[in-house]
Amino acid sequence: MTEETSQSPVIAIVGPTASGKSTLGIEVALQLNGEIINCDSVQVYQEIQVATAKVPLEERNGIPHHLIDFVPPSINYTAVEWAREAAKKIEEIESRGRVPLLVGGTGFYLRALRNPFFISPQTDESLRLRLNTMREQRGAEYLHRVLRRLDRRAAAQLYPRDWPRVQRAIEVYLQTGRSIVDQKDERPEAHESSRRLRILALNPPRAELYERINQRTEDHFEAGLVAEVQYLLSRGVPPNSNALGAHGYRRVVEYLEGKRDLPGAIEQTKLDVRHYAKRQLTWFRHEAGVEWFDGFGEEKNVLAAVLTALAGGPPSK
């Protein structure tokens, strides 16, 4: 028996933003003697709090949380870096006789962990949006100059006006630290992940999810989101950083730059987050072996269904 087949799959609790993943993760951890590894690309950053839905310390019920609040907001943290750290944390948690639980909605992170030698050409949402804005404001040739500074080999193979491939090459390099030239012949099936994942996904009613997103967005602005962005900018965090490219933060930056009014920033943020939730659901529906649970993570029947599945259900293939 190989090491991989002898080990239990690592549990991942995923779903769209505002679906109650964090609450469900804590409840499952309490039942399984678990510790949580954050799998959200925004919650890794220090100093950004208001719009990140990080669970406050006093609400974690004593459950240790890892890979949260540990990256300076001026640093563009990649999926590859997260996957390496997550793999280490999984081993550390298991060495203590406890159960690691991956909790979050960043599918790209999970894919990087599942396939440590392959990163899909898809990228995280904030990076793609920033590159789109860069191209719209400065043109495709500027984007090609950016690629040339990052990855001369890829730039030499692409025409400046072929912006979709230029942008893809930038995304791959920033996410993996490797040239797309080195990755273009790789396929996910060519590599085996060192650990299997058992992915449990929340599927709340769409209309209720969107209502929750709209209300949470308004709550974030009322809780001081604009002041938080002003503070981060005053600390020298670049406005085009991954941290400030996150949903909510990006539109506030535009508001502070005079590109839109505050009501417009709020409404656009609601739309952005609703679209993002839809894309998250689409992403996980395309992942193999995902087990779906209808409802929000705070619902007792959802917790009961998840615990029942974990007690006797088969792992994802």
Please give the residue ranges for each predicted region.
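Phosphate/pyrophosphate-binding catalytic cores of soluble transferases and nucleic-acid-acting enzymes
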Residues: 1-317
